[in-house]
Amino acid sequence: MNEVKVQRNYKDSIFRMLFKDKENLLSLYNALNQTDYTDVDGLEITTLENAIYMNYKNDVSFVFDFELMLYEHQSTVNPNMPLRDLFYVADILQKRIHDRDLYDSNLISVPLPRFVVFYNGIDSQPERQTLRLSNAYEKKQENPELELTVTVYNINLGCNEEIMNACRTLKEYAMYVERVRTYAKQMPLAEAVEKTVDECIAEEILSDFLRKNRAEAIKMSIYEYDEELHFKTLFERGRETGLEQGESRINKLNSILIHMDRLDDLKHATQDKAYQEQLMAELLSEGMQDM
């Protein structure tokens, strides 16, 4: 078998490719909202194709039923999703009203934003959790004037079964991912992915998608699994190292923060161990190598 090489830069994901399809996307919307819409013509895709932050890209966004939905797929826990979504939604809304006069006396209407993350990483997480932008504020306030909440759904196989059963594509995606992980423990990753693709096609699990996109799906699956394991290994290695390696991680963190001109974060991190660890986790989740 020829080795499949995948470069470490932004690539499409299986999740994103699946839910670029409007029928799949509407099915996912219905599953989350317990609705039964069928007209995909009313669904307006607003995904930011050029919105890349630290190797990450806005996955899927769309307007439907006067709502602006931002869907993101994550295989690593990222507490900074509210902040990223703030950037995304501001960009999307700016593009929607670019020719409107914000100084006009008439109110400019915009769709209601809603933010969802679909998590399927290997770290144990609750079936559902809420992330808040206010958690990142250096000064806490009971009712902050700017808030943004993100609902995180665990879509690993066996979680949120009501939603999974309502959206066949989402459930089959979870089955596919679980099988790749299972076989990857028994054989080389490339072989595990090939075997999974062959079996899923035979068993009618994402079969149409995999037949049409076999080569790309294999490359993406290898990349996604390898990246997930890479970040997990780095984090565990850092957490379990001794003092010398710990100091090395801290020095690396300080160097990155200085390079990014995040001097306030650097000062805060030197005074707060928990905040220091939070920054390390953030940089790992955003694709920083060798943290």
Give the positions of each predicted feature.
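Elongated, amphipathic alpha-helical interaction scaffolds
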Residues: 1-291
